[in-house]
């Protein structure tokens, strides 16, 4: 069996019992993850939303014990790659959502760490609605900090600083020094979930990638390590030697390689907070491709958010969109066996990290080794996984993307 599944306590991370999940699908991206069951329905597509498990999957001796195991958000699951150890290597973490109980089985969704933190808000205890006339005047200010330091400090505020808010997350960058500042007003609570604030920070120009990685703290407890890129290197750090995959006609360690192509966008109209003529605006553009010998036609896009409350923030977001789209791009996907030696090792290689792909005799791509960032992994109960890599410049326009 390639995988193991465990039930455990959401708050403490204490492992309870193993679960038998015969068929499932999973996915792992830079900042989020999913796990769902797959079932043969006879007709139509195979697939399911969330998990549907037979009662036999739960080692419970009574209905009361089943109820305790399925308490929504109080219990969680971890999917671990079976590496031969007793517990396996934890890969996917999720809190049990609201179950639907049937005679033969039970269905529920899993809430990833990011989803769970979508219902935690950056508001200090005792500071909401306590101003004159039931107003909220409290303002949270962070200054002289790194972006991941702000994220981790917000994480501590949204977890350990709240009653019943503890989660098994290690916020290891809290208070880290840097050159950034952020201000959050309590009255704007609807836009102050940790998930929303983290998404906003990650999407600014130079914003850090971040990820929650499960690991066994000891033989009984699973915890989540909050990993994030730094101000100087926003990408996630490598956890070992950069792996090399091979792809050539009729073989290789990565199979079914496909290439998606995307044209450039040369202008970004950015808008932020404000209304009508007072709306904050910024135009980011790079018209080099429109003025070359064999020009590209102009493509314009927009980017907007009412949360962008300063001219610099609007500029940063518009510049970020332009930087990601101003050249023609390609994106590679392929399948790998997780059991192949020298390939992708789960628990050592994570989305957001670098992978070398050596490509030969492809019908379109030039021969060479392409160093790309892994964006997502997805698979099922087998040892096969689909890898999706970050977009890179079209190699026929930029020969530096391979060697």
Regions found by a protein language model. Name each.
Residues 38-69, 247-403:
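An acidic/polar, Gly/Ser/Thr-rich interaction patch typically located in mid-to-C-terminal regions
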Residues 2, 46-50, 102-109, 219-223, ...:
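A generic structural signal for beta-strand entry/edge sites
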Residues 64-173:
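Surface-exposed cap/loop segments at beta↔alpha junctions
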Residues 1-28:
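Polar/acidic, low-complexity leader/linker segments enriched in S/T/G and N/D
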Residues 101-117, 169-264:
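Short beta-strand-centered interaction patches in the first periplasmic/extracellular domains
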């Amino acid at each position: 069996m390639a995988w193991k599944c465990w039930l455990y306590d959401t708050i403490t991370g204490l492992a309870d019992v193993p679960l038998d999940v015969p068929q499932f699908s999973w996915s792992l991206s830079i900042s989020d993850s999913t796990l769902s069951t797959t079932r043969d329905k006879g007709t139509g597509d195979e697939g399911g939303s969330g998990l549907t498990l037979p009662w036999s999957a739960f080692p419970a001796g009574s209905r009361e014990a089943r109820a305790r195991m399925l308490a929504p958000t109080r219990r969680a699951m971890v999917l671990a790659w079976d590496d031969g150890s007793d517990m396996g290597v934890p890969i996917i973490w999720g809190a049990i959502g609201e179950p639907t109980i049937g005679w033969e089985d039970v269905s529920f969704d899993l809430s990833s760490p990011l989803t769970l933190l979508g219902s935690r808000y950056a508001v200090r205890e005792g500071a909401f609605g306590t101003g004159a006339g039931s107003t909220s005047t409290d303002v949270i200010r962070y200054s002289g900090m790194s972006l991941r330091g702000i994220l981790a400090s917000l994480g501590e505020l949204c977890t350990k600083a709240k009653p019943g808010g503890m989660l098994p997350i290690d916020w290891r960058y809290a208070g880290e020094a840097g050159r950034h500042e952020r201000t959050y007003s309590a009255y704007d609570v609807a836009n102050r979930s940790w998930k929303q604030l983290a998404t906003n920070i990650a999407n600014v120009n130079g914003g850090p990638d971040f990820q929650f990685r499960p690991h066994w703290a000891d033989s009984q407890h699973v915890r989540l390590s909050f990993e994030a890129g730094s101000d100087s290197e926003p990408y996630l750090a490598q956890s070992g030697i950069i792996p090399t995959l091979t792809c050539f006609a009729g073989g290789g360690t990565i199979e079914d390689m496909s290439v998606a192509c995307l044209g450039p966008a040369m202008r970004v109209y950015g808008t932020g907070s404000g209304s009508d003529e007072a709306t904050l605006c910024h135009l980011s553009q790079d018209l080099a491709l429109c003025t070359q010998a064999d020009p590209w036609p102009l493509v314009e896009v927009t980017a907007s958010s009412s949360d962008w409350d300063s001219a610099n923030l609007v500029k940063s977001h518009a510049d970020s969109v332009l930087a990601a789209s101003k050249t023609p791009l390609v994106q590679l996907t392929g399948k790998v066996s997780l059991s192949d030696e020298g390939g992708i090792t789960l628990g050592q290689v994570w989305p957001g990290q670098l992978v070398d792909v050596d490509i030969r005799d492809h019908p379109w791509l030039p021969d060479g080794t392409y160093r790309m960032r892994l964006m997502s992994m997805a698979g099922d109960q087998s040892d096969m996984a689909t890898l999706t890599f970050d977009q890179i410049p079209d190699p026929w326009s930029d020969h530096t993307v391979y060697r």
